[in-house]
């Protein structure tokens, strides 16, 4: 194949990939990867509107700002929906550009043009390219990382200040996209020292050691002065957890297995053979440089992923898949240099077969939490079809593919191995895309109606009022789709689970909301997923998940801990009422219908106390209250809670009526199945 035709095919490959990934991304109804997607979108909007990297009006302690800067101009497009789709298209093009540095690397290592194109094509089917449909940094970080590796190989091969400067700039840009790549800066000089020492060029090694030592000294000084937590930002907690050698080794193995799937599985033995050959018998300085850079980068990424995995107890393929294209290039070298027939490849393929057949024994553990490992998400899709047999089927398929790698390798059929790698990648990518779309569809169905309801109603500088049991993901979903929400407030116990700024609200005697002693003068978007809240005026807009109220709205009645999905009471919460109108106190009644397996609902507080028997059959309960000011009654459900979505719930409950004089609830309807009970709040 001539060079001109190869270039045209490479450009066509990038464009087809970009269009296909954009089309698939546009089928996704809403963001699914919270809080990360909300973080990046909020930073982009804030940089565009204020020039500062803020989330909910406060610092996010997040230093990798290249992607928010690149995506900020897109938010000028108009609506959130339009900007969302344009960013997905931008990311699809960016991640498709990864084929270019992969092709360059393969050609630099003297892989034939056709085979280099095949390697580039398989790269675009890596399951983790599904991240082009979500607003994360991976779509930009992958091509930047691969380009930085190209620059490192060029600098290590031929030297020169200009080449080293290009590498330094690319390494800094990659670090600005994802902070984990700060390890790139010392990586290339370290490899250079090894190369020079192997060639007994100690003076050249000393010259490379100087900038490496300078980097280490500067990094140590910054960490010493600023502290690890400040330098690491949102990842500071990672350095406070205990890391055991056993756990590190275990999770490195699991992440290595996930990376093997991400790389196409069947080509992994050939990739390892290629790396070993390039390291032990390099025919050029480029061979040596590529092999050592790849091995060192692979080790660094696996250790980073293992550190994160110990905190989340799941494979962190998000942190390792960047090495998959490098493994594919190494496979291309093995294919080109006719190393597939070697015994080393046969032995490794046999080992791959054994690992595949062992997968069913720990499939549930490995695949049960795979949100950060797209190549493992296909297992969930298989579960929908095969149920508990999915692990067995997955293991058998992996074992058969390993055996196929053994047979095809012995015959030297590299083209067939590349084809199977593309097929594995396409299937795993399709499974991951299906899971992303399914999660997005479920979220959109639960939201109901328009997701940008506040923006469409003309809201401006609104505050989002959340409660004790409001899930962070629900907050982020609503705030993402409504740019009119400029801050998030929290009423009740606890803190937001995402770590973003959310000041606590204190209601006044008449239900007016205050933050730090100042009244909230903004329009209010009020969460409905984890509380029942009624204000002194009707909502401007009402949706299944949130309501929009005019500025100055006052709380009248509140059940903090009422989980609307499935009609539940949380294991603890409060009933509250504030005096309405000109009334001096809160006087009225609350009618509940309760049922469940936990036997008791306890009421506690100076204005109420009692214990209500809970039966499996629905029971109607009427609670009267008469307080000189605000009425507040804490409730608790002793016993075991049940996890529903992200909520810990105790019993089922329906709010039949919650009203104050002059309005009244209907007379108590009398005993129901299981016995009716009337409880009057104690003064």
Name each model feature, range by range.
Residues 119-121, 163-178, 189-190, 215:
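Membrane-interface alpha helices of multi-pass inner-membrane proteins
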Residues 26-38, 49-72, 76-77, 85-88, ...:
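Membrane-proximal lumenal/periplasmic loop motifs of glycosylation machinery
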Residues 24, 181, 185, 190-280, ...:
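Membrane-lumen/periplasm interface segments of specific transmembrane helices
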Residues 15, 89-110, 147:
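Transmembrane-helix motifs of polytopic, lipid-linked glycan transferases
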Residues 109, 148-164:
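Membrane-interface transmembrane helices that cradle and orient dolichyl/undecaprenyl
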Residues 493-683:
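C-terminal luminal/periplasmic domains and tails of membrane-associated envelope-modifying transferases
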Residues 60, 133-141:
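Short acidic/glycine- and proline-prone juxtamembrane loop motifs at membrane-interface regions
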């Amino acid at each position: 194949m001539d060079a001109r035709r190869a270039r045209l095919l490479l450009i066509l490959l990038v464009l087809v990939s970009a269009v296909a990934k954009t089309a698939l991304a546009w089928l996704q109804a809403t963001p699914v990867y919270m809080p990360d997607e909300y973080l990046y979108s909020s930073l982009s909007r804030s940089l565009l509107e204020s020039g500062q990297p803020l989330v909910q009006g406060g610092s996010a302690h997040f230093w990798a700002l290249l992607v928010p800067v690149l995506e900020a101009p897109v938010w000028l497009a108009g609506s959130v929906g339009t900007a969302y789709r344009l960013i997905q298209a931008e990311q699809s093009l960016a991640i498709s550009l990864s084929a270019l540095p992969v092709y360059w690397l393969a050609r630099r290592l003297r892989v034939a043009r056709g085979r280099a194109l095949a390697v580039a094509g398989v790269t675009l089917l890596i399951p983790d390219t599904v991240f082009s449909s979500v607003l994360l940094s991976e779509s930009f970080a992958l091509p930047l990382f691969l380009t930085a590796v190209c620059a490192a190989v060029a600098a290590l091969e031929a030297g020169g200040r200009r080449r080293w400067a290009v590498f330094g700039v690319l390494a800094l840009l990659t670090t600005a996209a994802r902070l984990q790549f700060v390890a790139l800066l010392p990586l290339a000089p370290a490899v250079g020292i090894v190369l020079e020492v192997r060639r007994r060029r100690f003076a050249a090694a000393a010259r490379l050691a100087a900038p490496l030592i300078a980097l280490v000294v500067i990094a140590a000084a910054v960490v010493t002065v600023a502290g690890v937590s400040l330098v690491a930002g949102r990842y500071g907690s990672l350095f406070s957890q205990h890391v055991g050698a056993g756990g590190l080794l275990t999770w490195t193995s699991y992440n290595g297995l996930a990376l093997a799937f991400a790389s196409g599985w069947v080509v992994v033995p050939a990739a390892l053979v290629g790396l070993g050959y390039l390291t032990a018998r390099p025919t050029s300085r480029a061979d040596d440089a590529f092999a050592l850079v790849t091995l060192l980068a692979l080790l660094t990424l696996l250790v980073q992923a293992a550190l994160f995995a110990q905190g989340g107890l799941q494979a962190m393929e998000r942190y390792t898949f960047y090495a998959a294209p490098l493994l594919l290039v190494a496979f291309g070298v093995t294919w080109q240099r006719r190393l597939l027939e070697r015994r080393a490849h046969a032995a490794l393929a046999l080992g791959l077969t054994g690992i595949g057949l062992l997968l069913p024994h720990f499939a549930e553990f490995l695949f049960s939490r795979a949100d950060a490992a797209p190549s493992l998400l296909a297992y969930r899709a298989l579960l929908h079809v095969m149920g508990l047999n999915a692990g067995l089927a997955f293991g058998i398929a992996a074992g058969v593919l390993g055996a196929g790698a053994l047979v095809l390798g012995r015959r030297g059929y590299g083209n067939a191995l590349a084809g199977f790698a593309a097929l594995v990648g396409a299937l795993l990518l399709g499974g991951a895309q299906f899971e992303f779309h399914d999660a997005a569809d479920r979220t959109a169905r639960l939201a109901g109606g328009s997701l940008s309801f506040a923006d469409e109603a003309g809201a401006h500088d609104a505050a989002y009022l959340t409660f004790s049991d409001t899930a962070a993901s629900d907050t982020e979903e609503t705030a993402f789709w409504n740019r009119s929400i400029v801050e998030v407030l929290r009423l009740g116990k606890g803190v937001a689970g995402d770590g973003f700024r959310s000041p606590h609200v204190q209601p006044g005697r008449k239900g007016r909301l205050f933050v730090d002693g100042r009244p909230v003068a903004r329009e209010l978007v009020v969460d409905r997923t984890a509380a029942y809240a009624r204000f002194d005026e009707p909502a401007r807009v009402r949706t299944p998940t949130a309501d929009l109220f005019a500025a100055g709205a006052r709380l009248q009645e509140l059940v903090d801990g009422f989980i609307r999905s499935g009609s539940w009471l949380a294991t603890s919460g409060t009933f509250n009422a504030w005096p309405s109108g000109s009334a001096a106190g809160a006087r009225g009644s609350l009618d509940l219908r309760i049922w469940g397996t936990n036997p008791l609902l306890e009421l506690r507080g100076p204005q109420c106390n009692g214990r209500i028997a809970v039966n499996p059959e629905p029971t109607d309960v009427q609670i009267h209250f008469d307080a000189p000011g605000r009425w507040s009654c804490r409730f608790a459900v002793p016993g075991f809670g049940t996890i529903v979505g992200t909520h810990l719930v105790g019993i089922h409950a329906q709010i039949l009526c919650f009203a104050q004089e002059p309005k009244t609830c209907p007379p108590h309807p009398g005993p129901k199945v299981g016995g009716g009970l009337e409880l009057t709040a104690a003064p």
